C-alpha cells in the first residue's frame, strides 16, 4: 500500500468532465466530486468562481475559492482509510480550460 497517491491526467480529466457538466450557466459552483480508480476513490470538495464572457457566456477564467482532495482506500479488513494525494488545482484548471 502506498503512503500517498498520484493524481493522473486521466483522473484530472474525469474530475474536469464532472465539474464542467455542473458549471453550465453558473458563476459559482460548490460541490463534491468522486472518481473511482481501481481499489481507491479520489474525492474532491471544491468551490470555484466561474468568470464568463458578458455576451456569449463562454467561460474565460476560473478562480478557486476552496478545495480539499483526498483518496479513500479500502483496507484488507474492508475498512476505508483516508490517504493523502498530490492534487494540484493548477492541473485541474488546465483540464477544465482545455489547456
Residue ranges and their predicted role:
Residues 2-28, 32, 55-99:
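Acidic, low-complexity intrinsically disordered segments
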Residues 35-54, 69-71:
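Beta-strand elements of well-folded, non-transmembrane domains
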Amino acid at each position: 500500500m502506498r503512503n500517498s497517491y498520484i493524481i493522473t491526467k486521466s483522473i484530472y480529466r474525469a474530475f474536469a468532465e464532472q465539474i464542467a457538466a455542473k458549471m453550465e450557466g453558473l458563476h459559482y459552483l460548490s460541490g463534491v466530486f468522486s472518481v473511482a480508480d481501481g481499489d481507491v476513490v479520489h474525492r474532491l470538495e471544491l468551490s470555484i468562481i466561474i468568470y464568463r464572457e458578458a455576451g456569449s457566456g463562454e467561460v474565460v477564467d476560473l478562480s478557486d475559492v476552496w478545495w480539499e482532495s483526498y483518496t479513500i482506500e479500502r483496507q484488507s479488513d474492508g475498512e476505508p482509510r483516508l490517504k493523502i494525494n498530490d492534487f494540484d488545482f493548477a492541473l485541474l484548471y488546465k483540464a477544465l480550460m482545455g489547456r
